[in-house]
C-alpha cells in the first residue's frame, strides 16, 4: 500500500533519516547564493506558473526551477524526480532521494529542520512532524534575503490544511527578516498580479 504523500513523519523516521543523511553532507544551502530581491515560489496546486528567475519549486511541481526544494520523507517517486539541477534537501528527507538526485546529475545542498541539533543551516518548514516542501521553499527564499516572494500554486487547502500551523511560523520568520510575501491567488498571502509584483 502506498503512503499518502502528506502523511506525518514519525520521530523515529526523523531520527533514522537524519542519521543516515548527515553522513553524506557535501554542500549546504550556505554554498548557494541568489542575489535577487524577488523570488518566485511555485507549488503543484497550479499547472501554469510565471516565467521568472530565480524560481523555487518542489520536485512534484514538475517545472524547471533554479532550486528544487523538498522535505519529503517518502521514497522518491520517479515521476517527480526527473530533472538535474540544484536541490535543497532537508536532513529528514528519505535517503533514497539524494541517491536519485545524484543519478540524475543534480547537485544537493542540505539544510536542517530548526529542531535538530547540528551545525547545518536551519530552515523552518512547518512544525515538528508536519513539514511541507512549499513552506521550506518560502523559508529558503527569505533565508537568501529576498525582499519579496510571490507564491504561485501554494494554497495549503484540503488535505494540505494541516500545514497551516507551520505556515504561521514560516510567515512570522519571513516578517522578522523583512521579507514580504504575496500570492497570485490570494489564498495564503496578499493577492497581486505578476506584473504588479
Positions of PLM-derived features:
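Metal-ion/cofactor- or nucleotide/acyl-coenzyme-handling active-site neighborhoods
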Residues: 1-197
Amino acid at each position: 500500500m502506498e503512503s499518502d504523500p502528506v502523511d506525518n513523519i514519525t520521530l523515529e523516521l526523523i531520527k533514522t533519516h537524519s542519521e543516515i543523511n548527515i553522513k553524506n553532507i557535501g554542500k549546504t544551502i550556505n554554498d548557494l547564493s541568489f542575489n535577487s530581491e524577488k523570488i518566485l515560489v511555485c507549488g503543484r496546486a497550479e499547472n501554469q506558473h510565471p516565467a521568472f528567475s530565480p524560481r523555487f519549486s518542489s520536485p512534484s511541481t514538475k517545472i524547471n526551477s533554479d532550486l528544487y526544494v523538498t522535505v519529503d520523507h517518502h521514497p522518491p517517486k520517479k515521476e517527480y524526480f526527473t530533472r538535474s539541477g540544484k536541490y535543497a534537501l532537508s536532513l529528514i528527507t528519505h535517503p533514497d532521494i539524494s541517491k536519485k538526485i545524484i543519478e540524475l546529475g543534480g547537485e544537493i545542498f542540505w539544510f536542517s529542520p530548526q529542531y535538530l541539533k547540528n551545525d547545518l543551516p536551519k530552515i523552518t518548514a512547518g512544525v515538528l512532524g508536519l513539514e511541507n516542501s512549499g513552506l521550506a521553499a518560502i523559508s529558503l527564499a527569505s533565508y537568501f534575503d529576498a525582499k519579496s516572494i510571490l507564491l504561485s500554486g501554494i494554497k495549503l487547502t484540503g488535505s494540505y490544511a494541516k500545514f497551516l500551523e507551520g505556515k504561521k511560523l514560516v510567515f512570522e520568520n519571513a516578517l522578522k527578516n523583512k521579507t514580504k510575501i504575496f500570492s497570485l491567488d490570494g489564498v495564503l498571502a496578499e493577492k497581486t498580479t505578476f506584473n504588479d509584483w
